[in-house]
UniProtKB/Swiss-Prot annotation:
Keywords: Endonuclease, Hydrolase, Nuclease, RNA-binding, tRNA processing. It comes from Shewanella frigidimarina (strain NCIMB 400). The keyword Protease does not apply. GO terms for biological process: tRNA 5'-leader removal. This is Ribonuclease P protein component. SUPFAM superfamilies: Ribosomal protein S5 domain 2-like. It catalyses: Endonucleolytic cleavage of RNA, removing 5'-extranucleotides from tRNA precursor. The keyword RNA-binding applies. Consists of a catalytic RNA component (M1 or rnpB) and a protein subunit. InterPro entries: Ribosomal_Su5_D2-typ_SF, Ribsml_uS5_D2-typ_fold_subgr, RNase_P, RNase_P_CS. It comes from the Bacteria. The gene is rnpA.
Amino acid sequence: MTSYTFSRELRLLTPAQFKSVFSNPIKASSAEITLLAIPNSEQHPRLGLTVAKRFVKRANQRNRIKRVIRDSFRLHQHDIPDIDIVVLVRNGVMEMENAELHKLIEKLWRKLSRRYNG
C-alpha cells in the first residue's frame, strides 16, 4: 500500500540543505510561487518551504499557505522525481483561495517533473 505521510525524511531541515538547492537549480514558476530543485541522493523527494513575512504579513495566512503546499506535496510525492525542492512564495499568493492555490502548485509539480525528466 502506498504511504501518503509527510515524515521528517521528506523535509529539508538544515540551512545547508536549503543552500544547496539555491546553487544552479531547475526552476518552475508562476507569478506567485517559484519552485527551485536539484537532484538528491535519496530515494524520495524532499520539500523545503519559505513564506516571507514581507509578502504574507499574518502568521495564520503564512501557515495556511504552507499547509496547502505541504498537503499537495504529500499527495503527489510519488509522482515527483528524487529531487530537493524549495518553494518560494511571492506577492499575490495571499489573495488566492485554498483550491486555487492547490491547483497552481499541482501545475508547478508537473512542470518541474517535466523539466527534470525532459
